[in-house]
Amino acid sequence: MVDVQGTVADGFEPVRDAFAANFARHGERGAAVVLYREGEKVVDLWGGTKTPDGGQDPDGGEDSGDRKGPTGRADSDDRKASTDRADSEDSDGHEGSDGGPEPWTQDTAQVVRSVTKGVAAAVPLLLHQRGQLDLDGRVSTYWPEFKAAGKERVLVRHLLAHRTGVPVLDTPLTPAEAVDGISGPRAVAAQQPVWEPGTAHGYHAQTYSWLLGELVRRVTGRTIGRWIAEEIARPLGLDLWLGLPEEQRGRVGRIATVEALSAPAAHGPRLRPKRSVAEAYRDPESLTRRAFAAITPLPDENDPAYLAAELPASGGVATAEALARFYAALIGPLPSARTARSGGRLFAPATLTMARTEESAGPDQVLVVGTRFGLGYMLHGPACPLLGPGSFGHPGRGGSLAFADPEARIGFAYVTNGMRRGVTADPRAQALVRAVRTSLAAREA
C-alpha cells in the first residue's frame, strides 16, 4: 500500500481516493496532484517513489543541498514538510535509509514532456498582450530566414495552432544537435512544409521546440527558458524550469516505464479513427512517425544534458504545485503572488479568450485523431478530455497533465514519473479529473 501524503480541503476527498487508487489500478510509480480553486490551493497530494528503479537521481551525483527555487528561496512559504528528509534519504540523497528507492516528496520535480508546451505558449501570448508580437504577423517578419522553402506566409498564429506544415524534418537531428541551440532553428527554417501552411493542422511534437524557441529569441533577445524564469517563474514563485539549473537536479524524479513506450497511443474508447496513432507510428513514412522522430534516437530524458536544454516542446521540469499555480495565475489573481501585475494574474481577459478560442479542429495530420487547439493550448474534447468545454491546457506523452478552467476557477496539475504508452488521455490523469468534477459538483449541489 502506497503512503499518500498531503492535504485536501473539505469536499475534495474524491481526489485523494482517485490518486491512491492509481497506484493499485494503474501501476503508478511516483506522482503528485495539485488543485487551485479561486487562487487558493485545495488539493496537494504526493506519493510513491522518486527513483522507481532504485537508481540514482538524474545527475548521478549528490543531492542539491538546500534545493533553492528560481526565486533563490529554499521552498514556497506555504509548504509543509512532507517527510523527515534525514530519515528518508542517505547522505547522497539517492536512496531511503533502508537502501530502497527514494520516496517522492512534496518538492519533487519532474520532466513533464509536452505539458511544457502549455507553459511555453504563454510566452508569445504575453508578448502580444504587451504589444511586442503580432499574432497575425508573418513569422518571417521576426525571423527572416524562416521564409525559405515556401514558408513566407506562415503566421505566428499558425505556429501556435500547429498549422505551419513543419511537424517533421527531412533529416532528423541527433540528441546533441537538438539541444545545441543552432541546429534545430536552422533545420526548421530550411524545411519545406508538408502541407500548405494554414490549411490543415498536425501536432508539432518535436519541431515546436525550435519554431517557438527561435521566434521568442528573435523577438525578445532572450532564450525562452530565460524569459519564463524572469517573467513567470520568479514573480509567481514557481519551481518550474525550461533549462534545469545544475543545483536543482537532485529534486528531479527519475523516469521509469509502467508499460512499453515503443509507440504513442491515444487512449479512450471514443478515439476510433480508420488508422490508429500506434498503427501510423509503425509506418516509417507516416507523418506520425516522422514527427516524433524529428530527434533520432529519442533523447534520454534522465540525462543531465537533456534536463539542462531549453526545449519548449518537451523539456520542462516542474512540480505539480508550480504547474497548478501557473494555470491558476493565467485565469485569475493569486493572493500570494510576488508581483504587482494584476495581483498575480497573467492573462488579460482578451488574451484568455485567444488562448481558448478554437484555431484548429478536426483530423490531426500527425495524431490521426480529431484534435482541438486554441493558440498554443489543447482544448477540451475526445482526444484531450479536460474538466469541461471551457478548459484549456496540455497533456504530456506518458501521463502528465495540466490545465485551467476559467468557469470552475481552477488550475490543475498532475505529474508522474511512471511513463505509460500514450500521448493524450492517460487513464490516471482522467481518473483525477473525474474526481475533481465530482467534488465540484457536490459542492455546488
What residue ranges belong to the model's regions?
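Catalytic loop of the DD-peptidase/beta-lactamase superfamily, centered on the K-T-G motif
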Residues: 2-52, 57-59, 92, 200, ...
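Tryptophan-centric aromatic hotspots in well-structured domains and transmembrane helices
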Residues: 12, 46, 103-104, 118, ...
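Short active-site loop at a secondary-structure junction
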Residues: 21-34, 53-60, 95-159, 196-206, ...
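Intrinsically disordered, low-complexity terminal tails and inter-domain linkers enriched
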Residues: 51-102, 266, 335-342
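Active-site helix/loop module of the DD-peptidase/beta-lactamase fold
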Residues: 102, 106, 111-115, 119, ...
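Generic structural signal for alpha-helix termini and adjacent loop/cap motifs
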Residues: 130, 162, 191, 329-333, ...
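Internal, well-ordered domain-core segments that constitute the primary functional module
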Residues: 171, 204-214
